[in-house]
Amino acid sequence: MYGIEYTTILTILISIILLNYILKTITNTMDYIIFRFLLLIALISPFVRTQNYGMYLPITGSLDAVYTNSTSGEPFLTSTLCLYYPAEAKNEISDDEWENTLSQLFLTKGWPIGSVYFKDYNDINTFSVNPQLYCDYNVVLMRYDNTSELDASELADLILNEWLCNPMDISLYYYQQSSESNKWISMGTDCTVKVCPLNTQTLGIGCKTTDVNTFEIVASSEKLVITDVVNGVNHNINISINTCTIRNCNKLGPRENVAIIQVGGPNALDITADPTTVPQVQRIMRINWKKWWQVFYTVVDYINQVIQVMSKRSRSLDAAAFYYRI
């Protein structure tokens, strides 16, 4: 009898000891795994670079802070600012430290060192198609060219607004524009655009559908054309397909974190499509053309006034001028 009781007690003690050993083993194993995992993270973290809105930029977020060197007495909202300029500016200045100089000057206006980025572009036409506007605020310097005033206003329309575009097969189909935000955008080295409006029987109105020479010419030998026709009317379209492409586009809305500073020219560009409205010049400003150093000094002086007519960061993160839908 006593032997059975002792055996039971011994079995219980052995079970407790074994359970304690198993729990300690599991705990040590988990500690080992967690330690190795944390060690691995610590070792690889210096080599891992995450993307901020599609580009390696140190986005600082939104932090209210007062900067003693700021000329503004109000707390400045820390943000990122991208300044886009023609490559000719850098070539004329010819100073390896010019960006650092400008950064120091922007600091006096409340922009901390490292919050302003400078990016050059070679061709405004190419830039407008895919501008890559990633900062909280984006300011584009566009040199005025009196030989392409119409192109410049249309380029500004592309940069300041977001567009959703579809390819068009004008050899098989006719098209119509459904609203004022619906436009046909043509690009190429030489774009001549002709249209023939159609009636409900698909017969030409004032033109013959079988003879492109009777079509109305809406653009001739241009690099960029934003075609606006009568809404709700079908049109046959003819373009120089070897040197030009055309897309059916809808304007989604303004990029309110983008502004254009026109350098030179008698008047600021007007990109308003509706002739009954006040010209849309709030985010298009003009400064007199001088040497590029003088242009940048003027930009620094007025940058905070420019920012006041903008909104921080557009709804689009990778803000390309076109969104293609295939």
Swiss-Prot record:
Signal peptide residue numbers: 1-50
GO cellular component terms given for this protein: host cell endoplasmic reticulum lumen; T=13 icosahedral viral capsid; viral outer capsid
Source domain of life: Viruses
Region (CNP motif): 165-167
SS bonds (residue pairs): C82-C135, C165-C249, C191-C244, C196-C207
Residues annotated to bind Ca(2+) 1: D95, G206, T214, E216
Modification after translation: Intramolecular disulfide bonds. N-glycosylated.
Entry annotated with the keyword Cytoplasm: no
This protein's record includes keyword Calcium: yes
Keyword list, A-Z: Calcium, Capsid protein, Disulfide bond, Glycoprotein, Host endoplasmic reticulum, Host-virus interaction, Metal-binding, Outer capsid protein, Signal, T=13 icosahedral capsid protein, Virion
Glycan-linked positions: N69, N146, N238
Sequence positions that bind Ca(2+) 2: Q177, D228, V229, D301
Subcellular location(s) of the protein: Virion; Host endoplasmic reticulum lumen
Region (GPR motif): 253-255
GO molecular function: metal ion binding
InterPro entries assigned: VP7, VP7_1, VP7_2
The protein's assembly and partners: Homotrimer; disulfide-linked. 2 Ca(2+) ions bound at each subunit interface in the trimer hold the trimer together. Interacts with the intermediate capsid protein VP6. Interacts with the outer capsid protein VP5*.
Similarity-based family: Belongs to the rotavirus VP7 family.
Biological role stated in the UniProt entry: Calcium-binding protein that interacts with rotavirus cell receptors once the initial attachment by VP4 has been achieved. Rotavirus attachment and entry into the host cell probably involves multiple sequential contacts between the outer capsid proteins VP4 and VP7, and the cell receptors. Following entry into the host cell, low intracellular or intravesicular Ca(2+) concentration probably causes the calcium-stabilized VP7 trimers to dissociate from the virion. This step is probably necessary for the membrane-disrupting entry step and the release of VP4, which is locked onto the virion by VP7.
Note: Some rotavirus strains are neuraminidase-sensitive and require sialic acid to attach to the cell surface. Some rotavirus strains are integrin-dependent. Some rotavirus strains depend on ganglioside for their entry into the host cell. Hsp70 also seems to be involved in the entry of some strains. In group A rotaviruses, VP7 defines the G serotype.
Protein name: Outer capsid glycoprotein VP7
